[in-house]
Design a protein with these regions (language model features):
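Generic detection of short hydrophobic beta-strand segments and adjacent strand-loop junctions
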Residues: 28-34, 87-90, 103, 127-131
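Solvent-exposed serine/threonine-rich low-complexity stretches and specific carbohydrate-binding patches
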Residues: 79-94
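Short, surface-exposed binding/anchoring microloops in extracellular/periplasmic proteins
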Residues: 29-76
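Exposed aromatic-hydrophobic patches
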Residues: 93-104
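Short, exposed beta-strand-loop hairpins at the edges of beta-sheets
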Residues: 60-63, 102-131
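A positively charged, amphipathic N-terminal helix/segment that binds anionic biomolecules
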Residues: 68-70, 78, 114, 129
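N-terminal prepro-regions of secreted/extracellular proteins
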Residues: 1-48
Length: 131
């Protein structure tokens, strides 16, 4: 009986550990210190219906006097620009910008700028700031 219990317990543990292999992976992030607080960059693949989409962004969680956040994305294989966003923030708290890529199921997308690379399967994100 103890062997059966152990087998069931181990089987359940393995299922929990590896059962989500095909699901969307968790967001990856990195941080960078700025004069106005810590900048966080992230990349997050996610599902919407049957399409695998991606989202990249930068946020800063403290009051800022002035900061410009820019995010750009290109399809890795061809270099095709698939979107960009850039916003200037002043006297704001918890500012941030995100960029979503729609309709690029199964492709590699590169988010790029000038700082802090984040790498995850098939995606790269770089956060970029000017202040």
């Amino acid at each position: 009986k103890n062997k059966i219990k152990l087998f069931v317990t181990l089987s359940f543990a393995l299922l929990m550990a590896f059962g989500n292999v095909n699901s969307v992976s968790a967001a990856k992030s990195t941080t960078k210190s700025t004069p106005y607080g810590t900048l966080k960059g992230f990349i997050s693949p996610y599902n919407s219906g049957s399409s695998k989409l991606c989202e990249g962004g930068t946020t800063i969680g403290q009051n800022v006097k002035s900061i410009k956040i820019k995010i750009e994305a290109k399809k890795t294989s061809t270099g095709t620009n698939i979107g960009s966003t850039q916003n200037q923030h002043a006297n704001s708290s918890g500012v941030g910008d995100t960029l979503e890529c729609w309709g690029y199921t199964g492709t590699k997308v590169t988010f790029y700028g000038t700082h802090d690379a984040i790498h995850t399967t098939g995606y790269h994100v770089y956060t970029s700031t000017q202040y």
